[in-house]
A protein has these predicted regions:
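Central regulatory/effector-binding core of bacterial HTH transcription factors
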Residues: 45-107, 177
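Secondary-structure junction motif
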Residues: 131-133, 138, 146-167, 234-238, ...
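Alpha-helical "hinge/linker" immediately C-terminal to small N-terminal DNA-binding modules
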Residues: 11-39, 45
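Single conserved hydrophobic/aromatic residue that forms the stacking wall/gate
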Residues: 1-6, 10-11
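Flexible hinge/capping segments at coil-to-helix
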Residues: 110-148
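Short beta-strand->loop
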Residues: 112-122, 207-220
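Hydrophobic hinge/microswitch elements
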Residues: 83-96, 102, 156-213
């Protein structure tokens, strides 16, 4: 009888140990989850995925990222650097939380668009083309000049091409480049007339290295925009950064 009772107690003790181990593991998991949730809510940890072009990163997003990192050093920020069409695809595919892009943008019921700041597209030239400085030009005169511009897969190129087509002009570029910084460098070397966003050219113009071409009808200004996906919520960290923008 003692042996039987002892066996029952042993079984009960073993079952209790097994139950306790599961309960303890569950409690630890819950405790860890609560701790991680608290860290997320208090901006001590987390990550943000952003899409941005060279233009929007340099002339809009970067100062905000610097300020955000000073406020919340524990938050990791991943930036996918790509032109506007690719950034839109990344957003709608769920690869980024939000994007900073340039208009015009395609109509999409899933995409929420918020205008951030105004931008202007201009043409610039170097000393080789000094005879154009101070003149008011017609866009048809671009047909006779070597043109340097961005590649086709950018919103900037699409916008400028569309505007010029309404003016009866189709650009036949000598050089098509992937970044606006390179356009400025090519123009500096007198390789042609550059189609560029004004912000990229301003420092060169201020120093007198390059000058802006003047036209009878300026290209209408457009906007940098913040885009997000209406179908998906964003993390606490992503929402906090959006509040700063």
């Amino acid at each position: 009888q003692r042996s039987l009772v002892g066996s029952e107690m042993c079984i009960r003790d073993s079952a209790g140990e097994i139950l306790y181990s599961h309960v303890a593991a569950g409690y630890e998991s819950i405790s860890l989850g609560e701790q991680q949730l608290s860290q997320l809510l208090h901006m001590e940890t987390g990550e943000i995925r952003i899409g941005a072009s060279d233009m929007t990163l340099q002339f809009y997003l970067l100062p905000y990222l610097e300020h955000f990192h000073q406020l919340y050093p524990g938050i990791k920020v991943h930036v996918t650097n790509a032109p506007t069409p690719s950034t839109i695809n990344h957003l709608l595919s769920g690869n980024i939380d939000f994007g900073i892009v340039t208009s015009p943008l395609p109509a999409d019921p899933h995409m929420e668009i918020k205008q951030a700041r105004e931008i202007e597209d201009i043409f610039i030239a170097g000393p080789r083309f000094s005879y154009l400085q101070g003149k008011t030009l017609d866009y048809h005169e671009l047909d006779e000049l070597p043109i340097i511009c961005l590649e086709h897969d950018t919103s900037t190129r699409a916008y400028v091409d569309t505007f010029l087509s309404h003016e009866g002009v189709t650009l036949q570029p000598e050089f098509e480049l992937s970044t606006s910084d390179m356009i400025a460098q090519f123009v500096m070397r007198n390789l042609g007339i550059g189609s560029i966003m004004a912000d990229f050219a301003q420092s060169y113009i201020d120093r007198g290295d390059l000058f802006r071409l003047q036209f009878k009808k300026p290209i209408p200004k457009r906007h940098m925009c913040i885009i997000s996906d209406r179908r998906r919520g964003m993390s606490v960290a992503a929402n906090k950064l959006m509040e700063l923008l």
